[in-house]
């Protein structure tokens, strides 16, 4: 069977008690299926102290863990602390296919990727997460949407390399929207722009990336159905005390 680590990185000052129900469910689920569960402080690695933004610091933390602690070729499921398991019969490895190393999923209510990921601890996976963490140092002076805004520009560049070189007017437009963004509406417009650039595909075997369509990923926002769930659900996001 595959070696899987579920990773939750808590920001300095946040308390496990705020997420007790979600974390309890993760602890029970990990024990049930033999997954490694790591709940860590984002101040653990000196190498990540350069990150002033706690959201990017989490991805630096993931990268350092991959380099220093987790087995090569093992898998990491990175989730927020407020994600809880509601159907423990579902397995993380059921989302994994041989030709893909990086998995994201689409949120329901807009064009957004969730900033949670399943990926492999190999050179490709480490390169991808380091690129994302390091985007903190090239953020535009705008309402940029922190790591989630950056993720969409990263994925546009990653999946459509011509968007980096200036060969694409749509790619340039997405970048300009981001650089001039003033509020969440502008961030959502930028995200929609990047998705237009990436296209209607879910599978990118040439880049070893798979994006799960709405409702097909491992988690969804709890508020969508007023905290109710079905047996089709696996994990719910936004479970707070």
Describe every region a protein language model picked out.
Residues 9-12, 40-43, 79-81, 105-108, ...:
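Active-site-proximal beta-strand/loop segments in catalytic clefts of secreted hydrolases
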Residues 14-17, 38, 46-47, 84-86, ...:
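Eukaryotic short linear interaction motifs
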